[in-house]
């Protein structure tokens, strides 16, 4: 007695007989190709047969794209397509011979065309998503460590496949298409990306939506941040949330346990130019937070993050020297500190010392840190730089910084940065030391305030001497 036929596949309630012979053969091959020795001994004729099945099955998908009512009849074809992709995916694992054989059959072009048809269907059945994912995995595997395959994948996939997949609602499709992009990109192709900035922006969005996904993160940190031309072209086109995401990853790169290399420094000098010039031009958007009108938190947060990047950049000796002489940066920072300090005194707003801290991550907390980081940046820019020390004096920045030294619940870290800034402003600078000593004598800076920031004034005869009570910190 013959064995009973297996139940037919089901899609959208319609019963469709499964093509048993081809499907079982493909599943057997897929299992065999999990072993390296089987991959290495596979004859090329097998891949031609798999490709023939793939092409034949793709006709049903093409028909469904032309006639949406045919989507219900795709079950058997999708089973075969999925197993073809799984078989080819496994065959390519660490086997350049198979990668080359499969590529030379023009399988890559067939796969990309089929994946684009999947996206065109706009159907989210699990069977279709599975075929979609397996197709992308195959493209990732055939391109892995194989420059010839990477070139062919790029020719067929760029830009349409990435534009179709990087913003897909399925996170696995986003991850697999990001893997293909990371694997295929090189220096020359980065230039092509500059002409298709929507793809780069989609990668930023993908990381924003799926921060746990490794591939968008690697594309940004290992590729985008090594291309100042791409970052400069892309940055003006990013919305505020996307800017914050990119700047956060830039901070992560700068503050990583692995310091910037010699090759990184010229690139990050270009980034420093972009960040500093953007901050100088746009920093006053933060003042909107002090207005009575509902502020644009996202715009202000993007500006605040620019300051955070500048603070971290000025910890690096090579980047510090460039930013210390950046035109208008120090002046703008002092001017902005003065404006928000006055705004905080005149009315009760987000910059007021009496403001209370709300939930973690609230914009008010970020704004309070903004004043601290302005003072921190002033201190960094004045580190062992007499020209900047004198410039702060000329701009009446020293009394301004001291006046900010009022500990409050809203800004518990402000005092430590005032201490740091005053130390850097007075190091080997007798003029600035004399100014602070005279301020204390005239009652413009009380002794308790100076003691709080680590100084005391001592009178020797007719001369006032500012003495430090703490060790000099580094930036």
Curated annotation (Swiss-Prot):
The modification Omega-N-methylarginine is found at residue 10. The keyword Cell division applies. The modification Phosphoserine is found at residues 12, 77, 430. Keywords: Cell cycle, Cell division, Cell projection, Ciliopathy, Cytoplasm, Cytoskeleton, Methylation, Neurodegeneration, Phosphoprotein, Spinocerebellar ataxia, Ubl conjugation. GO terms for biological process: cell division; cilium assembly; nervous system development; neuron projection development; regulation of cytokinesis. Coiled coil: none annotated. InterPro entries: ARM-like, ARM-type_fold, Ataxin-10/CTR86_families, Ataxin-10_domain. The modification Phosphothreonine is found at residue 82. The keyword Ubl conjugation applies. GO terms for cellular component: centriole; ciliary basal body; cilium; cytoplasm; cytosol; dendrite; extracellular space; membrane. Polyubiquitinated. Gene3D superfamilies: Leucine-rich Repeat Variant. Expressed in the central nervous system. It is found in: Cytoplasm, Perinuclear region; Midbody; Cytoplasm, Cytoskeleton, Cilium basal body; Cytoplasm, Cytoskeleton, Microtubule organizing center, Centrosome, Centriole. Signal peptide: none annotated. Its main location: cytoplasm. It is linked to Spinocerebellar ataxia 10: Spinocerebellar ataxia is a clinically and genetically heterogeneous group of cerebellar disorders. Patients show progressive incoordination of gait and often poor coordination of hands, speech and eye movements, due to degeneration of the cerebellum with variable involvement of the brainstem and spinal cord. SCA10 is an autosomal dominant cerebellar ataxia (ADCA). Homooligomer. Interacts with GNB2. Interacts with IQCB1. Interacts with OGT. May play a role in the regulation of cytokinesis. May play a role in signaling by stimulating protein glycosylation. Induces neuritogenesis by activating the Ras-MAP kinase pathway and is necessary for the survival of cerebellar neurons. Does not appear to play a major role in ciliogenesis. Belongs to the ataxin-10 family. PANTHER family: ATAXIN-10. This is Ataxin-10. The lineage of its organism: Eukaryota, Metazoa, Chordata, Craniata, Vertebrata.
């Amino acid at each position: 007695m013959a064995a009973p036929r297996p139940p037919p596949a089901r899609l959208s309630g319609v019963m469709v007989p499964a093509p048993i012979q081809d499907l079982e053969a493909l599943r057997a091959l897929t299992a065999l190709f999990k072993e390296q020795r089987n991959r290495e001994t596979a004859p090329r004729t097998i891949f031609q047969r798999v490709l023939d099945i793939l092409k034949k099955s793709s006709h049903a998908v093409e028909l469904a794209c032309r006639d949406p009512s045919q989507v219900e009849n795709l079950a058997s074809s999708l089973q075969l397509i999925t197993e073809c992709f799984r078989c080819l995916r496994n065959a390519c694992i660490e086997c350049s011979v198979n990668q080359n054989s499969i590529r030379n059959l023009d399988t890559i072009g067939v796969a990309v065309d089929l994946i684009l048809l999947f996206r065109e269907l706009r159907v989210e059945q699990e069977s279709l998503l599975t075929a979609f994912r397996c197709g992308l995995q195959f493209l990732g595997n055939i391109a892995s460590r194989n420059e010839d395959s990477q070139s062919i994948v790029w020719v067929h996939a760029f830009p349409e496949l990435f534009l179709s997949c990087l913003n897909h609602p399925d996170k696995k499709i986003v991850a697999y298409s990001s893997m293909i992009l990371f694997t295929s990109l090189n220096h020359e192709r980065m230039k092509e990306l500059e002409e298709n900035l929507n793809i780069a922006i989609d990668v930023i969005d993908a990381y924003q939506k799926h921060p746990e996904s490794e591939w968008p993160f690697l594309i940004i940190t290992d590729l985008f941040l090594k291309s100042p031309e791409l970052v400069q072209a892309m940055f003006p086109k990013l919305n505020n949330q996307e800017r914050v995401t990119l700047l956060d990853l830039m901070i992560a790169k700068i503050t990583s346990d692995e310091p910037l290399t010699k090759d990184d420094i010229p690139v990050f000098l270009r980034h420093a130019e972009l960040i500093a010039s953007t901050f100088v031009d746009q920093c006053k958007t933060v003042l909107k937070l002090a207005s009575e009108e509902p502020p644009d938190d996202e715009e202000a947060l993007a500006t605040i993050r620019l300051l955070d990047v500048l603070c971290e950049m000025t910890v690096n000796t090579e980047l510090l020297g460039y930013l210390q002489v950046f035109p208008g940066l120090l002046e703008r920072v002092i001017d902005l500190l003065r404006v928000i300090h006055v705004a905080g005194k005149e009315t009760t707003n987000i910059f007021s010392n009496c403001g209370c801290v709300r939930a973690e991550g609230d914009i008010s907390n970020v704004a309070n840190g903004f004043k601290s980081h302005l003072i921190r940046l002033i201190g960094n820019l004045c580190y062992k730089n007499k020209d900047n020390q004198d410039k702060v004096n000329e701009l009446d920045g020293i009394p301004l910084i001291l006046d900010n030294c009022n500990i409050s619940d809203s800004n518990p870290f402000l005092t430590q940065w005032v201490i740091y800034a005053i130390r850097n402003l007075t190091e080997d600078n007798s003029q600035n030391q004399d100014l602070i000593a005279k301020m204390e004598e005239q009652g413009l800076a009380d002794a308790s305030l100076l003691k709080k920031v680590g100084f005391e004034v001592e009178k020797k005869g007719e001369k006032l001497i500012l003495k430090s009570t703490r060790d000099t910190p580094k930036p």
